[in-house]
């Protein structure tokens, strides 16, 4: 696969963002594309952002096999939600899994899986003066509450471990989550000051070699990480057709 930002042939060369721009490309790709992307091993990418119009949303929905009438009011609701979220720091360009979850939640296609009622993360120094992060999380499946604990290299890793290391206790979902791994974690500070907004991006993978990307935004880095992590779990469960929680 070509490097994303490589001139002429990179994936970014075939990304389309503005609403009118996307509408024109759908009618005639030659209006904005210098070459068929498939000729250089790439594909057309319709970006969903605060500049998006209905054309962007409909194109993205079709690409993930969501069939919905163009006149359905849920399309406008999704478009407004995307713009509101972009305003506070979200960016769905490169976070396809989080966008799909958002779209399916608004349309009503995502069931409830694991509810996380509360969580707590703390740091401490051990006898070797190494910082160790610990996390506790109360999970709920089918009305049963389960307290999970874990440690890790940093608060996000600890929270991830608290959930996944106790997956055997989640009999209903253990077989779906056992092979889930976080392979990349990125943090971006969107503004300055003590109330700076943080955007966290997580890349996940499974034993089938599938990769997906999720995002979380908050003034608290742990909360932003938590949102991205939960999206990763929900996406895996949805794609593997896991049963809903009762």
Identify the meaning behind each predicted range.
Residues 3, 153-173, 177:
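A short, contiguous, amphipathic alpha-helix enriched in charged residues
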Residues 64-65, 70-73, 168-182, 236-244:
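Glycine-rich phosphate/pyrophosphate-binding loops
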Residues 148-156, 162-163, 201-208, 226:
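Terminal-proximal interaction/regulatory segments of ATP-powered molecular machines
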Residues 49, 147-155, 213-224:
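Short alpha-helix boundary/capping segments
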Residues 209-246:
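Mixed-charge, glycine-accented linear interaction segment located at domain edges/termini
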């Amino acid at each position: 696969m070509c490097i994303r930002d490589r001139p002429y042939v990179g994936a970014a060369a075939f990304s389309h963002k503005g609403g009118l721009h996307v509408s024109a490309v759908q009618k005639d790709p030659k209006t904005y594309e210098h070459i068929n992307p498939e000729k250089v091993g790439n594909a057309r990418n319709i970006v969903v952002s605060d500049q998006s119009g209905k054309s962007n949303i409909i194109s993205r929905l079709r690409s993930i096999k969501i069939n919905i009438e163009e006149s359905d009011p849920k399309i406008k609701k999704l478009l407004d939600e995307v713009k509101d979220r972009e305003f506070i720091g979200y960016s769905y360009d490169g976070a396809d899994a989080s966008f799909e979850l958002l779209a399916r939640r608004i349309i009503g296609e995502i069931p409830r899986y694991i509810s996380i009622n509360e969580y707590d993360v703390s740091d401490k120094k051990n006898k070797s003066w190494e910082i160790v992060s610990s996390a506790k999380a109360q999970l709920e499946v089918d009305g049963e509450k389960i307290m999970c604990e874990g440690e890790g290299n940093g608060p996000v890793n600890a929270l991830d471990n608290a959930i996944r290391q106790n997956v055997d206790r989640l009999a209903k979902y253990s077989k779906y989550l056992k092979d889930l791994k976080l392979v990349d974690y990125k943090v971006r500070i969107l503004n300055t000051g003590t109330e700076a907004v943080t955007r966290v991006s997580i890349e996940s993978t499974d034993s089938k070699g599938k990769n997906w990307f999720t995002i979380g935004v908050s003034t608290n880095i742990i909360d932003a990480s938590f949102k991205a992590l939960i999206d990763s779990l929900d996406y895996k469960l949805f794609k593997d057709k896991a049963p809903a929680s009762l």
